[in-house]
């Protein structure tokens, strides 16, 4: 038979990698591992850049006392509450636009200031690697949508909204000084990113848009009336790109791997996040 593995059935709609859905699985039970973290479904479209996905075959559900076990069985019912800590929101124009890199840099800078930092990934397909990497740079806690019972946020908006409410409640219980929140993919994709951004809008003190190129910055800005504090990612890789972002949108772009730009970000964080917390 081969190895037996446990995962979660779900959907993925990655613009640069894989599209798949467990609902498309045929009677033969053949499907794929849509992520390395155990999101299972039948791949229906895949980038030619990728190696072949791991093929798997459905053998049955995990059960306990003759009842199907689901991720939501392990989500504790909690009284709803909203965090009162400032939120740094990191959004992107697509996947692989530098969001996690930017989040890690921000987390490290805030941790160096002695702040209690919670890092969270609000949307995407289950892959714990991204958010877990924030622990390595000083986050006190990390949480994502999996902790709210979702293997992927490609789901009905009502279901996602309930999961997001639980996630924010969990974060509030940790009493952070500051929250670094990454919205995976982009707000225009079917991961409920727009829902997440709307829900957090009253809490956001600083926003970073990670973009694949300067024109993508303009597209997201126009589509969502989103004016970030700074732009990062490939759209800030060169001085030509930085100048074009400024010309198109009026927003400052920073190559966060550059020492001078990183220092500019640190001063921005000190002014908008650290100083108000110390008063």
Where are these regions (language model features)?
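Conserved catalytic-core segment of NTP-binding enzymes
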Residues: 17-18, 24, 33-73, 157-173, ...
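Solvent-exposed alpha-helices and their adjacent loops that cap or buttress functional pockets
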Residues: 35, 78-84, 95, 109-112, ...
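Short glycine/serine/threonine-rich phosphate/pyrophosphate-binding segments
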Residues: 99-105, 127-131, 187-192, 216-218
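N-terminal phosphate/diphosphate-binding loop that engages ATP/GTP or pyrophosphate donors
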Residues: 108-151, 223-226, 239-249
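Charge-biased, low-complexity intrinsically disordered regions
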Residues: 26-30, 74, 79, 112-116, ...
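Short, charged beta-turn/beta-strand-edge "cap" motif at the junction between a beta-strand
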Residues: 9-14, 47
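Loop/turn positions that initiate beta-strands
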Residues: 1-6
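Walker A (P-loop) phosphate-binding motif
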Residues: 72-125, 236
């Amino acid at each position: 038979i081969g190895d037996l593995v446990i995962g979660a059935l779900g959907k993925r709609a990655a613009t640069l990698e894989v599209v798949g859905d467990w609902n498309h699985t045929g009677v033969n039970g053949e499907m794929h591992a849509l992520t390395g973290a155990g999101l299972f479904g039948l791949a229906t479209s895949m980038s030619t850049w990728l190696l072949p996905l791991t093929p798997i075959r459905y053998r049955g559900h995990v059960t306990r006392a003759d009842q199907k076990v689901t991720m939501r069985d392990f989500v504790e019912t909690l009284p709803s509450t909203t965090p009162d800590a400032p939120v740094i929101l990191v959004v992107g124009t697509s996947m692989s636009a530098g969001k996690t890199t930017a989040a890690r840099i921000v987390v490290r800078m805030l941790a160096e200031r002695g702040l209690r930092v919670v890092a969270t990934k609000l949307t995407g397909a289950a892959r714990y690697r991204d958010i877990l990497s924030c622990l390595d740079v000083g986050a006190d806690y990390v949480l994502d949508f999996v902790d709210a019972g979702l293997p992927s946020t490609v789901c009905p908006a009502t279901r996602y909204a309930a999961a997001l409410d639980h996630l924010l409640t969990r974060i509030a219980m940790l009493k952070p000084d500051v929250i670094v929140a990454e919205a995976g993919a982009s707000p225009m994709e079917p991961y409920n990113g727009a829902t997440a951004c709307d829900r957090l809008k009253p809490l956001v003190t600083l926003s970073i848009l990670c973009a694949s190129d300067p024109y993508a910055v303009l597209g997201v800005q126009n589509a969502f009336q989103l004016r970030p504090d700074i732009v990062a990612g490939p759209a800030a890789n060169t001085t030509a790109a930085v100048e074009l972002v400024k010309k198109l949108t009026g927003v400052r772009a920073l190559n966060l791997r550059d020492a001078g730009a990183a220092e500019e970000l640190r001063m921005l964080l000190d002014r908008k996040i650290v100083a108000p917390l110390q008063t």
